[in-house]
Swiss-Prot record:
PANTHER family: PORPHOBILINOGEN DEAMINASE
UniProt superkingdom: Bacteria
Function: Tetrapolymerization of the monopyrrole PBG into the hydroxymethylbilane pre-uroporphyrinogen in several discrete steps.
This protein's encoding gene: hemC
Record-level Gene Ontology MF annotations: hydroxymethylbilane synthase activity
Organism: Myxococcus xanthus (strain DK1622)
Protein name: Porphobilinogen deaminase
Length: 314
C-alpha cells in the first residue's frame, strides 16, 4: 500500500484549497497516508495581460501540471474540470471526480448591483467568452471588460477599474469563503454553466494501479454521469480552440438531462438545446445534443470563430 502521495497543483489560493481538500479526502479514507503538494505556475497564470482565448485557451492552466505527472514528479494532479480540454495527453486518465459543488454563475456587483439593476452601458468584468456571450445576449448595451487572474485578483481589479461588477463561478467563491461579495446567483436558465463547472478533476497516470486504487473512494457516480454527458458535448464542439459554449447536465434517478449552448461572443447569435435520456447513454446524449446544435446554426458560429482565431494567429 502507498504511504506517500504527491499532488501537483497550481499556486493560486483556489487551486491550493482544492488540492488540500483532495488531500484531506484521501487521508480521511486512508489513515496514515502522507500527502505533499507540488506547487507549480502554469502558462495561464503567467500570461494575464490578454484574454484567455487570445493566448491559447483554457488548456494553458493544465499543461505543465500534466507534464509533471508524465515525468513522475507527482502522483496525482488536481484541476478544475472546466479548465480542461476534451482530450487528455496519452498516458493520463481522469481517475476520479468528487461530488460537484454548486455549478452556477454569480454576479458580484459593486454597491449591491444585480444584472437586473445594471445601468445602461455598464462595464462588467469577465474573462469568459461564454459569460460574455450570455450576458450580451440579454443586455447588448453592457460593455464587457476582460478581467483575468485568480479570484481575489479579479475582484480587486473590478473595484480598481470602477466596473459595475464581475461574473464569477459560485463554487470558487464558496470554497474560498468569499460568498459575501455575491449580489446575485444566476440559475442555469439565465446563465448556463461551463462544462465541468464546480467539479474537481483528479488526474493520474493510466498505468499507475496503486494510485488509481487510492482514488476509488473519492469517485462520485452521479457527478461522473453528468460530466460524461457534458464532456461528450464539448468534444464534438471544441474544434481545437476556445469557443463560447456551455453544457450542464443533471441526473434524476435513471435519467440525465443535458442543456447546451453555443453563441457568438457578442451575444448576437445564440443556439440553445437540450436532451434527456437514460444515464447509460450519457456519452451518446452529449454527442446527440452537439449534432443538434451544429445542425441549427452552431456550425456556422464555430466556423466563423475559427476563421477569426486563425486570422489573429497568422
Amino acid at each position: 500500500m502507498m504511504t506517500h502521495v504527491r499532488i501537483a497543483t497550481r499556486q493560486s489560493p483556489l487551486a491550493l484549497w482544492q488540492a488540500r481538500h483532495v488531500g484531506a479526502l484521501l487521508t480521511s479514507r486512508h489513515p496514515g497516508l502522507e500527502v505533499t503538494l507540488v506547487e507549480m505556475t502554469t502558462e495561464g497564470d503567467r500570461f494575464l495581460s490578454a484574454p484567455l482565448s487570445a493566448v491559447g485557451g483554457k488548456g494553458l492552466f493544465v499543461k505543465e501540471i500534466e507534464q509533471a505527472l508524465l515525468d513522475g514528479r507527482a502522483d496525482i494532479a488536481v484541476h478544475s474540470l472546466k479548465d480542461m480540454t476534451s482530450v487528455f495527453p496519452e498516458g493520463l486518465i481522469l481517475a476520479a471526480v468528487p461530488e460537484r459543488e454548486d455549478p452556477r454563475d454569480v454576479f458580484c456587483g459593486l454597491g449591491g448591483l444585480t444584472l437586473d439593476t445594471l445601468p445602461q452601458g455598464a462595464r462588467v468584468g469577465t474573462s469568459s467568452l461564454r459569460r460574455s456571450c450570455i450576458l450580451r445576449s440579454r443586455r447588448p448595451d453592457v460593455d464587457i471588460v476582460s478581467v483575468r487572474g485568480n479570484v481575489q485578483t479579479r475582484l480587486a481589479r473590478t473595484r480598481e477599474q470602477g466596473l459595475a461588477g464581475a461574473l464569477l463561478a459560485y463554487a470558487g467563491l464558496k470554497r474560498l469563503g468569499l460568498e459575501d461579495v455575491i449580489t446575485q446567483v444566476l440559475p442555469p436558465e439565465v446563465s448556463l454553466p461551463a462544462v465541468g463547472q464546480g467539479v474537481l478533476a483528479i488526474q493520474c497516470r493510466t498505468d499507475d494501479a496503486r494510485v488509481r486504487a487510492l482514488l476509488v473512494p473519492l469517485e462520485h457516480a452521479t457527478t461522473r454521469i453528468a460530466v460524461t454527458a457534458e464532456r461528450a458535448l464539448l468534444a464534438k464542439l471544441e474544434g481545437g480552440c476556445t469557443v463560447p459554449l456551455a453544457g450542464y447536465a443533471t441526473v434524476s434517478g435513471d435519467t440525465v438531462f443535458l442543456r447546451g449552448l453555443v453563441g457568438r461572443p457578442d451575444g448576437t447569435h445564440v443556439v440553445r438545446g437540450e436532451v434527456r435520456g437514460p444515464v447509460s447513454q450519457a456519452h451518446a446524449l452529449g454527442e446527440s445534443l452537439a449534432d443538434d446544435l451544429l445542425s441549427r446554426g452552431a456550425a456556422d458560429i464555430l466556423r466563423d470563430f475559427a476563421r477569426r482565431f486563425e486570422a489573429r494567429e497568422s
